[in-house]
Amino acid sequence: MAAPNSLISLLGRTPDPEQLRHVHTIPARKAVNEPWPHWVHPDIVDAYGTLGIQEPYRHQIQAADLAHSGQHVVIATGTASGKSLAYQLPALDAIHRSELRVLSDPGKIHDDGAVTLYLSPTKALAADQLAAIRALKLPTVRAETYDGDTDVASRRWIRDHANFILANPDMLHFGILPNHTWWARFFRRLRYVIVDEAHSYRGVFGSHVANLMRRLRRICAYYGAGNSFPEPIFIAASATASDPGVSFGRLIGAPVREVSEDCSPHGSTTVAFWEPALTDVRGENGAKQRRTAVAETADILANLVSSRVRTIAFIKSRRGAESIASITKRLLDEVDPSLPGRVAAYRSGYLPEERRALEQALRSGQLLGVSSTSALELGIDISGLDAVLVAGWPGTRASLFQQIGRAGRAGQDAIAAFVASDDPLDTYLVNHPEAIFDVSVEATVFDPGNPYVLGPHLCAAAAELPIGPGELDLFGPTSEDLLDRLVDQGYLRKRPAGWFWTHPESAAGMVNLRADGGGPVSIVDAETGSLLGTMDSPQTHYQAHTGAIYVHQGESYLVEDLNEADHCVMVRRVNPDFYTTARDVTQIEVLETSRSVQWGDVTVHFGDVKVTTQVVSFQRKALISNEILGEEPLELGARDLFTKAVWFVVDNRSLHGAGLVEAEFPGALHAAEHAAIGLLPLVASSDRWDIGGVSTALHADTGVPTIFVYDGHPGGAGFAERGFEKAKIWLTATRDAIKACECDNGCPSCVQSPKCGNKNNPLDKAAAITLLGVLLKDAT
């Protein structure tokens, strides 16, 4: 491979491409090794030796030592740093030694055997870990996956005999905890719980998993009372994150030690910051639009593949991954007809054998280019890659580092490029690389106390075992009031010994781990009658309204009918050259203010709000150019959302003092609100679509100009609260992003929003910069 700096010229068609905004070099890192700990059985050391692992890295041993000594621990280091060895070592050693004791005295009943539970967010990652465990060929270790694909006979054998079980949170919630009496032997012996990819548990999903971990701990305590280890040790593997020990401690509800110094070797990585050029395509209000990240990334991928540079392009959506692959193939066919066959899309939804074949083709070099969703971001072992492209901000710095870490995995130098999408956050980051590399990685944000999440988990916990008064601390300070509310609603019955589940139906069914309520709506293929999938009711107005393009496993479907009464959406398979975006109008009411801070004449609040939203129309936009092809009205009912918000209050006098007149207030507030929504993911691990906003020159509850930004989930998800805590950093970045945009009057890269039901009108870019200056004047 050529030197990384020379590869920059391959990204574009000239040695100094105009789209290149900045170049940042991540320096190479040498390995720091440690000897094997004295407590590790020689058989375990020998097993790793057969795989070529002779001496572990320091961070692996630090984490393994902490877990072996009985302390909960999280290891938060980079991609390909060997985190799995850190949790495998104590777990396999405990299993191996306990099995050897059984073999040495087969006539004796042994009650102190050790077992391990491994949890991952995806079945694919669990399958890879299973292969890694089996590769060690330790005859004492009986490792098996336990998920929705496991047949009934195998489940019984796994419960009774497996000592290293790999599962996911969904199976723990639906299959294991509600049936804990079947698992009594397992829970009595459970020594370690491994939580892989812990940074992925954020937002509402993270809130659910946090309560799931508390339920797991109380079941373990029930079966472990009186044992030599009454509660298992939790070990987490995480991407780099801010305060990983604090975050994982909040996830499991217990103090945690952290190991975050990466001592594995890595070649240098040259990171290019790439902003697609403005085009002649005009969007709303005549604003110029940039070339899309999809089209730009496909161009770059074609350039790299034609130079035989092995490359992965990451993008968040399945449709985006498929589009990048198809455009790249078309471009390569014009250059060399042998090359299109060496490019493929990789996404979730493939059959296991298809996924394995793609991974092997990439490892062997048969494939030169892959466009992928985050399926490859997780810890699947793909090595020997030369370049990584990231199409659009992946959501968090942790995800970005996970993705660019795929290049140069075997220690060689590599190149990565961040290709900006046409939105405020990407605009800011591509012009401010220091916001990625010179600050700590963002915290993992979730709220276990969200009553819409905690309530159903309290019901599930009570169904598993009655909740005693001494357990209230485990579920947080709001749990007692919430339990009494559940009694009033008829879900629970209170007795002197605690709270009991009294309903005949499954309490676990009240919880949807990966969504936030509203009940599932079925997505049905109108031609075949087959069920394609389900969607939460709150999402349907945005993603499954009549006329919407719905994407399932890379295939596009046109929504023909949304039947809310029957909870059903009928779709028909199509092959469109456009996508759809819903637009809404919103009203907001302040219910309660929890926290406030004064910035001179500006007040920043955080608290409870009622948001009333109505989807009023949708736009069709060209896949490649983002050109608006048309807009159609929708007649959908308004919906209420009770959630959390942060809001900024400023009086007219302060705005007048900055030179603004009242006619400019609405456009300034509206533009600042849009940009602030786009920039919140900079400080909170949210997606732009997780949050919403409202601005008004005269709000009924404040009586003055106000900007609201709220969590788009019932009860909140922690994003707005993070915005309140980091408000100065957040608004400073918002102002800088608007300033950095080269447009004249506002565009999708700075102050326009694809969701705006007011057709991005009024917007005043210059006045928004002035307004943000007023808000920040006395910020602390």
Where are these regions (language model features)?
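Auxiliary Fe-S-binding modules of radical SAM enzymes
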Residues: 481, 743, 755-758
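Helicase motor core with emphasis on the C-terminal RecA-like subdomain
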Residues: 8-51, 55-58, 62, 68-74, ...
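Extended Lys/Arg-rich polyanion-binding regions
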Residues: 414-416, 422-436, 457-468, 484-485, ...
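Acidic, low-complexity intrinsically disordered tails
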Residues: 106-108, 774-780
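Structured, non-catalytic alpha/beta "coupling" segments that mediate domain-domain communication
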Residues: 2-20, 317, 553-562, 568, ...
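Short cysteine clusters
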Residues: 741, 746-750
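Juxtamembrane regulatory segments of integral membrane proteins
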Residues: 749, 758-759
